[in-house]
Amino acid sequence: MAEKEEVKLLGIWASPFSRRVEMALKLKGIPYEYVEEILENKSPLLLALNPIHKKVPVLVHNGKTILESHVILEYIDETWPQNPILPQDPYERSKARFFAKLVDEQIMNVGFISMARADEKGREVLAEQVRELIMYLEKELVGKDYFGGKTVGFLDFVAGSLIPFCLERGWEGIGLEVITEEKFPEFKRWVRNLEKVEIVKDCVPPREEHVEHMNYMAERVRSS
């Protein structure tokens, strides 16, 4: 009989970065222990496992610590090969990694960090910059159910956890509509497809609480 594996995930309920890791673990069918962290009072365990960044997510697998959501997703895919989340083709895999960085670096910074600090006029300028970036994702989705084709995978988890199930809730809290059906029909169709996937639905934070949390996070950014 195979020895039981230790798989533990430290996360925060509203964090898109830990939610995407949960999506991957659920897709792979990997049993895991989830440890909820508190943003303002991080546990000694988290600080010991991630002393450099002191952030979630942290994955612990048989005593080994894996940090940063993109790295964790790739580790999960390589460790448990069933239901692959990264494309098998090297070129498609490179594109998925590129667009994942676009989401987490550029769209996140413009659509949340900069927007939280901007006044109303500045937000409109930043919203247009976000639209220009999301248009690249819109083009990638033409003719596809998901970024990888017919099944959810790496880029769906990264972009889905951050944009429709996080940033859009922040924009909702300040009364700003950034992504419209008219301008982004493929993106909106993709979101509807994601909302039907059981493992995704299981990991999406409750809307009202999340909108409140995003308002709180924006306040933290403004006061930092």
UniProtKB/Swiss-Prot annotation:
It is found in: Cytoplasm, Cytosol. The modification Phosphothreonine is found at T151. GO terms for biological process: glutathione metabolic process; response to oxidative stress; toxin catabolic process. Its main location: cytoplasm. It holds the Pfam family GST_C. Transmembrane segments: none annotated. Keywords: Cytoplasm, Detoxification, Phosphoprotein, Stress response, Transferase. Glutathione binds at S15, P16, N41, K42, K55, V56, E68, S69. It catalyses: RX + glutathione = an S-substituted glutathione + a halide anion + H(+). Its EC number is 2.5.1.18. Residues 5-84 form the GST N-terminal domain. Residues 89-217 form the GST C-terminal domain. One of its GO terms (cellular component) is cytoplasm. Induction: By auxin. One of its GO terms (molecular function) is glutathione transferase activity. The keyword Cytoplasm applies. Belongs to the GST superfamily. Tau family. In vitro, possesses glutathione S-transferase activity toward 1-chloro-2,4-dinitrobenzene (CDNB) and benzyl isothiocyanate (BITC). May be involved in the conjugation of reduced glutathione to a wide number of exogenous and endogenous hydrophobic electrophiles and have a detoxification role against certain herbicides. This is Glutathione S-transferase U5. It comes from Arabidopsis thaliana. The gene is GSTU5.
